[in-house]
From Swiss-Prot:
It comes from the Eukaryota. This is Protocadherin alpha-7. Residues 30-697 are extracellular. InterPro entries: Cadherin-like_dom, Cadherin-like_sf, Cadherin_CBD, Cadherin_CS, Cadherin_N, Protocadherin/Cadherin-CA. Keywords: Calcium, Cell adhesion, Cell membrane, Disulfide bond, Glycoprotein, Membrane, Metal-binding, Repeat, Signal, Transmembrane, Transmembrane helix. Residues 30-133, 134-242, 243-350, 351-455, 456-565, 581-678 form the Cadherin domain. Calcium-dependent cell-adhesion protein involved in cells self-recognition and non-self discrimination. Thereby, it is involved in the establishment and maintenance of specific neuronal connections in the brain. Residues 896-910 have a biased composition (Basic and acidic residues). One of its GO terms (cellular component) is plasma membrane.
Length: 937
């Protein structure tokens, strides 16, 4: 017989020999025997040799032996007869404790050939242990004031046997005050207790002696008893009461020392000392409980003071009592059940297998990215592992098999929003506390070309000065692409188009990489004011994506054009203009008018006129209008003035720096009786039939002027009568004006009937204004094709400024400044136009416009301007504001060609007479000259 407790020097060799022979030697078997505990030495167990099929004669030669893992002296085999018998006393409670099953395992080994047999000998329990109470006597102190059905817990008996042998029943000795409350089978945790069924009276029965008997279920029955000494207390009639009779707590087996287990709470309805509670374990608590737990007497807190071992004890039942300080003291009882929980000491393990990394951003949902396997060496709940993913979006974990997961794409990706994800896979077991392990997964998102280059704004406005050097950098376009690498590599190009007769690429170019826009040639504001084109941005992706941006390049004007004089048809030698002026003219008489044009625009084309001083500081009786260019007398001429004057007129613009031009006017003073045969008074730049005036008979002019004066007086009288009549419309009324043009060579008129609202202001007239229509008399195509003016006719900036001080009707416009030049337009509001849509823009300061002026108006339904070389439908010769007198004609009346509109100018009719009153012919001649001067103005 060989047992592990004995020392066998050849055991290692034997074990090695057994392992080698086990590969080819068979012959294994298993036998079951049973033996009651407490069997005496030599008690028969079984015929082991016969049951194993071995001959008695071969037991010794084959080295028959039985090996046990525990005590080797309990069983023995007789090699002579092959019988297994009891060798020493077997105590089941000592061998297996309170385990439900108890057996002795033997390994029977025979050699030649090697055979191993397993034999299990079951040790059956017998009722050899009586019930035992913790103490032979239990003292109980019960107040006489305790109510009926009060329960007093008792510590039950314990039986070392198992099964029916440990099933206990209790009985109490007969009495009239108490009965025994025995918990049912499903209330094993609930302690045994005495229940009061009759009120106690200390004066009648101060003490009670009862006997509690416990009987097991064995055969024969065994019993145990305890003496119950009950002392009846007086006065303190309220015992402490716990919140619960049973507290259940779970503690892990590796709980640290000093950990609070529970804080049971008891309350006492008494006051003073009778309500002060002291906590303690019950007097009959086991020493094992006292070695592991401690209870604070004042707070009742139970803490851990010893090591907890799940394998040693899975639960601890702690009886607790709360005793007040009354006399006699009262006690409340409860039970604390501490369940020891096994510790989860193995964390899960994760294994990752990457399949498709990096993942393209256009991958479809459901694409598998990584395979994950988990493993936990624990068992039960502690080995059940679940996986989770953080962050979840846009991925998810899919369980494919037990402990196997797939990391798949859950929603669409966008590399431009998130280019990479750092995912954490957490594997957590079901233990308490749970253990976990984590693994990081780096998911990189590969870029695809899904974003076109984008500009910051759809269009840009660029201002470039004209006359820039070739290759000048004018702007830089920049487009951003949210993609990466070559998908974000942006190149720029022009969207080719035609600019007039030339290609766009002849004006500008764009650098393909930097997006810088260059002007390939000097830009000319007079030729090109606005250059609008598109720049395209394309990335290098496959397929390439792109977008366009619009550039509006405004060419800013510079003062690069000097004023140009408009040459007259009849002039003096050397480019000078000759003018003949009678000595009889008074102050303010217009001698000539210098006309010039500037190809620039804005202030660069706004012209002013200055009269250069003569040498030696001599004064001359002439001046020039600052913005009109009109040369007029500053005083009345007399005999002391030089007969000839050379006037130098400086024309300059308002640019920076200012550019100038010079005009020479030769003025000759003649006597009043001499005819100005070669006068060019019409001013520089005026062309037309006025030059034919030189050859007209002076007497014919005097006759025409006389007839015209009579007609004017008639019209003024008629108009005054008409205006004095009451009007239903007040100051503004609808009339039919008949507009007639009168010139120095006669009257040429074209009646144009139109219903208009004319508003006349109040106040005395200050000067003459004559309105006329440039239309010809009624004739073939005269209505549609008005007479063309001299192509040299242009309005300069000064003339345009002067026109702002004139009264202009609805169809008034401004002529273009010159060929290729910009339109100098100052929109204003006309008092003859009631539309509120008309814009209001003031002309430049100093342009000759005051707050009382009637100015041009552009608005819906009003033509802006006539084309180059055309006269406007109606215009006003510049002058100061005056009261307009308009003749009204019946609807069907015939309009005579001699009908015209004129404005009275009393100062011309009241000239100082230098001749005798009887010389009427000379007076008429002067009136004719005055009329001619007015027409020039």
């Amino acid at each position: 017989m060989v047992c592990p407790n004995g020392y066998d020097p050849g055991g290692r060799h034997l074990l090695l020999f057994i392992i080698i022979l086990a590969a080819w030697e068979a012959g294994r078997g298993q036998l079951h025997y049973s033996v009651p505990e407490e069997a005496k030495h030599g008690n028969f167990v079984g015929r082991i040799a016969q049951d194993l099929g071995l001959e008695l004669a071969e037991l010794v030669p084959r080295l028959f032996r039985a090996v046990c893992k525990f005590r080797g002296d309990l069983l023995e085999v007789n090699l002579q007869n092959g019988i297994l018998f009891v060798n020493s006393r077997i105590d089941r409670e000592e061998l297996c404790g309170r385990s439900a099953e108890c057996s002795i395992h033997l390994e029977v080994i025979v050699e030649r050939p090697l055979q191993v047999f397993h034999v299990d000998v079951e040790v059956k329990d017998i009722n050899d242990n009586p019930p035992v109470f913790p103490a032979t006597q239990r003292n109980l102190f019960i107040a006489e004031s305790r109510p009926l059905d009060s329960r007093f817990p008792l510590e039950g008996a314990s039986d070392a046997d198992i099964g029916e042998n440990a099933l206990l029943t209790y009985r109490l000795s007969p009495n009239e005050y108490f009965f025994l409350d025995v918990p049912t089978s499903n209330q094993q945790v609930k302690p045994l207790g005495l229940v009061l069924r009759k009120l106690l009276d200390r004066e009648e029965t101060p003490e009670l002696h009862l006997l509690l008997t416990a009987t097991d279920g064995g055969k024969p029955e065994l019993t145990g008893t305890v003496q119950l000494l009950i002392t009846v207390l007086d006065n303190n009639d309220n015992a402490p009461v716990f919140d619960r009779t049973l507290y259940t707590v779970k503690l892990p087996e590796n709980v640290s020392i000093g950990t609070l287990v529970i804080h049971p709470n008891a309350s006492d309805l008494d006051e003073g000392l009778n309500g002060d509670i002291i906590y303690s374990f019950s007097s009959d608590v086991s020493p094992d409980i006292k070695s592991k737990f401690h209870m604070d007497p004042l707070s009742g807190a139970i803490t851990v003071i010893g090591h907890m071992d799940f394998e040693e004890s899975r639960a601890h039942k702690i009886p607790v009592e709360a005793v007040d300080k009354g006399f006699p003291p009262l006690a409340g009882h409860c039970t604390v059940l501490v369940e020891v929980v096994d510790v989860n000491d193995n964390a899960p393990q994760l294994t990752l297998t990457s399949l498709s990394l990096p993942i393209p951003e256009d991958a479809q949902p459901g694409t598998v990215i990584t395979l994950i396997s988990v493993f936990d060496r624990d068992f039960g709940v502690n080995g059940q592992v679940t996986c989770s993913l953080t962050p979840r979006v846009p991925f998810k974990l899919v369980s494919t098999f037990k402990n196997y997961y797939s990391l798949v794409l859950d929603s669409a990706l966008d590399r431009e929003s998130v280019s990479a994800y750092e995912l954490v896979v957490t594997a957590r077991d079901g233990g308490s506390p749970s253990l976990w392990a984590t693994a990081s997964v780096s998911v990189e998102v590969a870029d695809v070309n899904d974003n076109a280059p984008a500009f910051a704004q759809p269009e840009y406005t660029v201002f470039v000065k004209e006359n820039n050097p070739p290759g000048c950098h004018i702007f830089t376009v920049s487009a951003g692409d949210a993609d990466a690498q070559k998908n974000a590599l942006v190149s720029y190009s022009l969207v080719e188009l035609r600019v007039g007769e030339r290609a766009l690429s002849s004006y500008v170019s764009v650098h393909a990489e930097s997006g810088k826009v260059y002007a390939l040639q000097p830009l000319d504001h007079e030729e090109l004011e606005l250059l609008q084109f598109q720049v395209s941005a394309r990335d290098a992706g496959v397929p390439p994506l792109g977008s366009n941006v619009t550039l509006q390049v405004f060419v800013l004007d510079e003062n690069d054009n000097a004023p140009a004089l408009l040459a007259p048809r009849v002039g003096g030698t050397g480019g000078a203009v000759r003018e003949l002026v009678p000595r009889s003219v008074g102050a303010g008489h217009v001698v000539a008018k210098v006309r010039a044009v500037d190809a620039d625009s804005g202030y660069n084309a706004w012209l002013s006129y200055e009269l250069q001083p003569v040498a030696a500081g001599a004064s001359i009786p002439f001046r020039v209008g600052l913005y009109t260019g009109e040369i007029s007398t500053t005083r009345a001429l007399d005999e002391t003035d030089a007969p000839r004057h050379r006037l130098l007129v400086l024309v300059k613009d308002h640019g920076e720096p200012s550019l100038t031009a010079t005009a020479t006017v030769l003025v000759s003073l003649v006597e009043s009786g001499q005819a100005p045969k070669a006068s060019s008074r019409a001013s520089l730049g005026i062309a037309g039939p006025e030059t034919e005036l030189v050859d007209v008979n002076v007497y014919l002019i005097i006759a025409i002027c006389a007839v015209s004066s009579l007609l004017v007086l008639t019209l003024l009288l008629y108009t005054a009568l008409r205006c004095s009549a009451p009007s239903s419309e007040g100051a503004c009324s609808l009339v039919k004006p008949t507009l007639v043009c009168s010139s120095a060579v006669g009257s040429w008129s074209f009646s144009q009937q139109r219903r208009q609202r004319v508003c006349s202001g109040e106040g005395p007239p200050k000067t003459d204004l004559m309105a006329f229509s440039p239309s010809l008399p009624q004739g073939p195509s005269s209505t549609d094709n008005p007479r063309q003016p001299n192509p040299d006719w242009r309005y300069s900036a000064s003339l345009r400024a002067g026109m702002h001080s004139s009264v202009h009707l609805e169809e008034a416009g401004i002529l273009r400044a010159g060929p290729g030049g910009p339109d100098q337009q100052w929109p204003t509001v006309s008092s003859a136009t009631p539309e509120p849509e008309a814009g209001e823009v003031s002309p430049p300061v100093g342009a000759g416009v005051n707050s009382n002026s009637w100015t041009f108006k552009y608005g819906p339904g009003n033509p802006k301007q006539s084309g180059p070389g055309e006269l406007p439908d109606k215009f006003i010769i510049p002058g100061s504001p005056a009261i307009i007198s308009i003749r009204q004609e019946p609807t069907n009346s015939q309009i005579d060609k001699s009908d015209f509109i004129t404005f009275g100018k009393k100062e011309e009719t009241k000239k100082k007479k230098k001749k005798k009153k009887g010389n009427k012919t000379q007076e008429k001649k002067e009136k004719g000259n005055s009329t001619t001067d007015n027409s020039d103005q």
